[in-house]
Regions:
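Regulatory and interdomain segments flanking nucleotide-handling catalytic cores
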Residues: 1-243
């Protein structure tokens, strides 16, 4: 946590702050331009600060997921946003293609392992032993939502107990963004436009999810006797990525 006098130089509330603050005020050390499509685009005044933040993020993600890793691309800022945007995305493609696969430490021959992941068992609940990844996933799922028990979600146990997994990804979002941004070259205009576009995409998809859930809840009494349990479990609803 930064001291109050320094926090004003690190701008993270990208939906609310001045999109040109970093460009106009040299005391601003860092500013999030926008977050969208699973990526965060950030301006840093100094390379050392960029390195420190990325180290913190990598450790934070590892501690809270155990099995995910952070991919980071860095390019030098110019005055042409369009060229910089293309350059950093090209660098990210290169990084992802060449970065080593980061995996948690596996089990030694004398260790008990998780039957699903193969990772060492590290935790014990009242009912079972868990690996670190399984423990973190369970902690992330609210205890009040019993849709984690699949039998509670089906309409009937037996022949009609099949569950479906739906994954929706806005595959045309990249083209939409590219078409929108290809004629914008200044950072001020580009950041403002990208922020509005990212918020619009996120709001539209979340609104669609909410409407879908309302519809499913409305028809639940017609297809299931016990309506105390939902017919669905929302796993991910972030931007244009829904599961």
């Amino acid at each position: 946590t930064l001291p109050c006098e320094k926090s004003k130089n690190y701008l993270t509330e990208w939906k609310d702050d001045d999109p040109e603050a970093f460009l106009k005020d040299s005391s601003v050390e860092m500013q999030i331009m926008f977050i969208g499509g699973g990526n965060a685009y950030v301006l840093f005044r100094r390379g050392e600060e960029c390195q420190n933040v990325n180290k913190f993020l990598a450790e934070y993600i590892l501690n809270r997921t155990y099995s995910l890793s952070l991919a980071v691309a860095v390019v030098k800022k110019t005055e042409n946003y369009s060229e910089d945007y293309n350059a950093i995305n090209e660098e990210m493609r290169r990084i992802k293609a060449s970065m080593p696969l980061s995996m948690p430490m596996g089990a030694m021959p004398f260790m008990a392992v998780d039957s699903v992941t193969g990772y060492p068992l590290t935790e014990k609940t009242r009912e079972e032993y868990l690996c670190t990844e399984a423990k973190l996933k369970r902690e992330a799922f609210p205890e009040t939502e019993d849709e984690k028990i699949f039998d509670n979600m089906v309409t009937e146990k037996g022949d009609s107990s099949t569950l479906a997994v739906f994954h929706i990804d806005g595959n045309s979002m990249g083209k939409k963004i590219k078409d929108k941004m290809q004629k914008i070259h200044t950072y001020g205009d580009a950041v403002r436009t990208m922020r509005a576009l990212s918020i619009d995409i996120s709001d539209t998809f979340l609104e669609t999810v909410d409407e879908t859930k309302k519809y499913i809840d409305s028809i639940a009494p017609r297809v299931k006797k016990d309506t105390s349990h939902k017919l669905y479990r929302e796993i991910i609803a972030a931007g244009d990525d829904i599961t």
